[in-house]
Amino acid sequence: MLLPREFVTYLSRQIVQRISGTAIDTHQPARVIEIVDTLINDEMAAEDRLNDEVRDLLEDYSDYMRKEGISYQDMFRKIKNTLVQKKKIVRASGRDTGDGMKLSRDKITDISHKLVALMRKSRDLRLKKDQNDVRLDIVKAFTEILQVEEKADRASRDKVRSVKRDIPEGSEEFDILQKKYYAEELKKYGVEFGR
């Protein structure tokens, strides 16, 4: 997943906390957090399923790629772009679209539309503002939190790269150190998953 599940839960809590009182009224914030968390996790899982489908298709094309001299990454990108267009999926990865965050601006907007639609149907809350204003508040909160996450992610990767010995990116040791430093960096920004 592009975002760790614990971070998605934190993100959901923060979004609900930031829009409660101003954009929505709820007597059951835990239920609203659950709605937000479920939707975001489902959206992230859809991207993972798409990537798995692309990998399965790539296995079928391995001989063709070898004969034509096409790299795995290029073919992955081509097949994924084709499936994204065919299935009308909004691309989740912000780095693929040039956004500075892990999630693309388009994906954040797509999720905000779906959240507002779910909120309108929910009996656990009441919208205090116009639908679009609520959606814009969600996008703003989402973006601010993801920008902090991006800073923490970048700082943790830089920390691992600055270790005296050479640790190749993608190795198990790199991943373990990066997760440790990532948690430390998030704490510096006041992001704790236990709350």
What are the residue ranges of the model-derived segments?
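Alpha-helical oligomerization segments
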Residues: 152-195
